[in-house]
Design a protein with these regions (language model features):
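Cytosolic, low-complexity regulatory segments enriched in Ser/Pro/Gly with interspersed Lys/Arg
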Residues: 1-8
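Canonical BTB/POZ domain core
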Residues: 3, 14-101
């Protein structure tokens, strides 16, 4: 076996493990580094999750180098942001027909 021989490693349940890690980070309120402000509420999140899941948030965060930025969402309801974050972190969101529009 030569030192230049390469091995292929696979993490069989990678997607499930990452999804569970995202859920745990949010549920346990670990390492939050961004706040979204709407309807007089502050919702904590992770810049890496917002950036990976949304070009909108990625652009905002790229333009704001602050270690813990506040993103003000005027005209957006708390429940809407909560639904979006649930979708980003969990891959699912429960919405009423009215909320879909």
């Amino acid at each position: 076996m030569s030192s230049s021989e390469k091995f292929f490693l696979r993490w069989n349940d990678f997607e499930a493990s990452i999804s569970e890690a995202f859920r745990e980070l949010r549920e346990e309120k670990d390492f939050f580094d961004v706040s979204i402000v709407c309807d007089d509420f502050q919702i904590q999140a992770h810049k890496v999750i917002l950036s990976a899941c949304s070009p909108f948030f990625r652009t905002i965060l790229q333009c704001n180098p602050h270690p813990h930025p506040l993103i003000y969402m005027k005209g957006v309801e708390y429940k809407e942001i909560e639904n979006i974050l649930n979708f980003m972190y969990l891959g699912v969101a429960r919405l009423t027909h009215e909320e879909l529009s």
